[in-house]
Amino acid sequence: MDIPLDAAEIRPEPPNSLDLNGSSTRKIKLTAPNINLSLDHSEGSILSDDNLDTPDELDINVDDLDTPDEADSFDYTGQDDQPALGEAVQEDFESIQEYTAEEERADNRLWRTVVIGEQEQRIDMKVIEPYKKVISHGGYYGEGVNAIIVFAACFLPDSSRPDYNYVMENLFLYVISTLELMVAEDYMVVYLNGATPRRKMPGLGWMKKCYQMIDRRLRKNLKSFIIVHPSWFIRTILALTRPFISSKFSSKIKYVSTLAELSELIPMEYVHIPETIVKLDEELRESESPKAGCLPNEPEMNTLEEEFENKMGDND
C-alpha cells in the first residue's frame, strides 16, 4: 500500500537567486602561477634567460612584411591642397623683407616728439614732408637776434585731399614747434599771401587754433605781422578773428601790397620768396593795381575793399 506524501514535502525549495539565463553558472577557480619579482637572474625571475627569446624565435622574414605599396592607404582629402598651401606660406615668408638698422633709424625719423603747451605731441613728418617749405627763417632785423619768420601760404596743402584735416593737424604742430625753435628774442612774421588759391587758404578754425596754441612768450615777443599781397579773403578772415584776438595783436598787423614795399621794412637778403609770388608781384605792378592785391583767379574788388576799410575805420 502506497503511502501518500504531502504536497508540501515534494515541493522544491524556492531559489535564493533568479536565474535569468535559464542555466546555472559554474564558478571556475584559477590559480595564478608563481612569479619571482626579484631583479636577479635566478630561475623564475623576470630577468631570467629562460624568458628571453632565442635568436631563432627573433628571426623575422622581411619578405612577409607589407611594404607601403602593398599596404592599404587612406585617401586624405587635403592631400592635393598641401603643395599649394606650402607654396602660399613660402610666398608669405618671401614677401617679408629684412628690416635693416638704417631703415629702422629712418622710420624713427618719420615721427617727431614735441612739447607744446606742456603736452607731448607726435608729428607725422612723412605726411607733411611736401609742405615743410611753408615756414622758413628769413634772417634777422635790427640789433641782436630778432628773427624774421616767413610763412608762405602757397605751400599749404590742397583742401581737396582726403586726409586734409590730418595733414593740417600735423602741419600745425610742425609750424608751432618750429617757431619756438627759431625764435630766441623778438621776432616778426612775414605772411606771403599771394599766389595762393582759395582751396589752399587755411580756414578760420585753423588760424584761431594756431593763435591760441602759441606760447605767451611768443605772443609777447611778436613785434610785427606783415601780410604781403593781401586779398579780400584774408582781410575778411582777419576781421572775423578780431573777437578772439587781443587788440595788441591787431595793432601789429600790417598790409604790404608789393615786394618793394616789403623791402623798405625789412632786409630781404635771406628772405626766400617763391617764384610764383615774384611773378605775381610783377603782374600786379604792370597792371598798376598794387592796392587790390587780388589773386589772378580772383575778380577785382577795389570797391568792396574800400567799403571794408571805411567800416573798419568807423569801428576804430
Swiss-Prot record:
Query: For the CRAL-TRIO domain, which residue ranges apply?
Result: 128-285
- Please give the InterPro entries that the UniProt record associates with this protein: Bcl2-/adenovirus-E1B, CRAL-TRIO_dom, CRAL-TRIO_dom_sf
One Gene Ontology CC term in the entry: cytoplasm
One GO BP: apoptotic process
Segments carrying the region annotation (Disordered) are 1-24, 287-316
Q: Which UniProt keywords apply?
A: Apoptosis, Cytoplasm
Q: Where does the protein end up? A: Cytoplasm
> Using the chain's own numbering, where are the disulfide bonds?
none
Q: Is Membrane given among the entry's keywords? A: no
PROSITE patterns the UniProt entry points to: CRAL_TRIO
In Pfam terms, one family for this protein is CRAL_TRIO_2
Would you tell me the protein name for this molecule?
Protein prune homolog 2
Q: What is the lineage of its organism?
A: Eukaryota, Metazoa, Chordata, Craniata, Vertebrata
